[in-house]
């Protein structure tokens, strides 16, 4: 019997998969517990429509990420952060990704999750630093962060 999986079932299939399984297993376990439904013409066309909508949504998200990348990598987009520093231009403390995200939100009204900012080590010196930001699994931008002394 052909079924469409509604959830991931370990060892059998993932959500959205169409597979042939034994009739008894399908009727007595998969369909009964809501893990799958029978694959007929109506359910197959509904699945195709859902996949098409999912692809369209993913394309929109990718387009938004590329638009955000263009804005963040613009020459004029420089995130300025003030911090206390010593005479040798080393900071007292450091600037973590959370502070960069807050400054980006204040200065450019861009809400960005601090976990998307891929800062290997917190910034500990004055000057310009290029910081990578993962906007999408295919799109990564670099923002300029300028640390100035208070």
Curated annotation (Swiss-Prot):
Top-level taxon of origin: Bacteria
Biological process according to GO: translation
Cellular component terms per the entry's GO annotation: ribonucleoprotein complex; ribosome
GO molecular function, one term: rRNA binding
SUPFAM superfamilies listed in its UniProt record: L9 N-domain-like, Ribosomal protein L9 C-domain
HAMAP family referenced in this protein's UniProt entry, alphabetically: Ribosomal_bL9 (MF_00503)
Protein name, entry field: Large ribosomal subunit protein bL9
Annotated organism of origin: Enterococcus faecalis (strain ATCC 700802 / V583)
Gene designation per UniProt: rplI
């Amino acid at each position: 019997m052909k079924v469409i999986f509604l959830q991931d079932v370990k060892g059998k299939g993932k959500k959205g998969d169409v597979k042939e399984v034994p009739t008894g297993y399908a009727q007595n376990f998969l369909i009964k517990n809501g893990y799958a439904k029978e694959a007929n013409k109506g359910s197959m066309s509904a699945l195709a429509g859902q996949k098409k909508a999912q692809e369209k949504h993913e394309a929109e998200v990718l387009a938004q990420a590329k638009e955000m990348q263009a804005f963040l990598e613009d020459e004029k987009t420089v995130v300025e952060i003030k911090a206390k520093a010593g005479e040798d231009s080393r900071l007292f403390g450091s600037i973590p990704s959370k502070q960069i995200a807050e400054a980006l939100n204040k200065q450019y009204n861009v809400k960005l999750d601090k976990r998307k900012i891929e800062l290997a080590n917190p910034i500990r010196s004055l000057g310009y630093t290029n910081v990578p930001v993962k906007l999408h699994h295919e799109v990564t931008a670099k923002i300029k962060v300028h640390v100035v002394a208070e």
